[in-house]
Regions:
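Aromatic-residue-lined binding/catalytic grooves and analogous aromatic/hydrophobic interfacial grooves
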Residues: 1-144
Length: 144
């Protein structure tokens, strides 16, 4: 069975044996594979569209905001130990990546940004709702 649904949860719902996540480098012999197998199905990203109003308009600080979580989203003096040193790009690259017409910007940044890695397949519907709400909150923290 090949499950190509959004969440990849048809096999679980059907009671079919399944395996999820990325295989390890030892399993695949691929340099791009992670060193250890994981259960990441697909990152959840709540994309944000922002508008530049030309003046300081800052959203309220989200509860639990920790600037260290996003310190290496782009190259800066506070980025000391990036998770992926080869992928730390400039702030200009980040802004250009999501530039839209009419002074708007799409915020969809995979590099220590607003991608939220979670395995929704193994969760109950209630747990999924909480996790998805947290993913939205995570994007708000990144925007802040």
């Amino acid at each position: 069975m090949i499950d190509a649904t959004e969440l990849g949860d048809v096999a679980k719902i059907c009671g079919v044996k399944y395996d999820i996540g990325m295989e390890s480098r030892d399993d695949t012999h691929e340099d791009i594979a992670p060193e250890k197998k994981n259960n990441i199905v697909q990152d959840i990203t709540y994309v944000a569209i922002l508008k530049d109003y030309g003046k300081d308009v800052t959203i309220p600080e989200p509860e639990g905001y920790d600037p260290k979580e996003f310190a290496c989203a782009c190259a800066s003096p506070v980025c000391i130990t990036p998770k992926e040193p080869d992928r730390v790009w400039s702030k200009d690259m980040m802004i250009t990546y999501g530039r839209l017409p009419n002074h708007k910007y799409m915020i969809n940044w995979p590099i220590e940004g607003n991608d939220y890695y979670i395995n929704l397949i193994e969760m109950t519907p209630e747990e999924r709702l909480k996790a998805l709400e947290y993913a939205k909150h995570y994007t708000m923290c990144f925007v802040y």
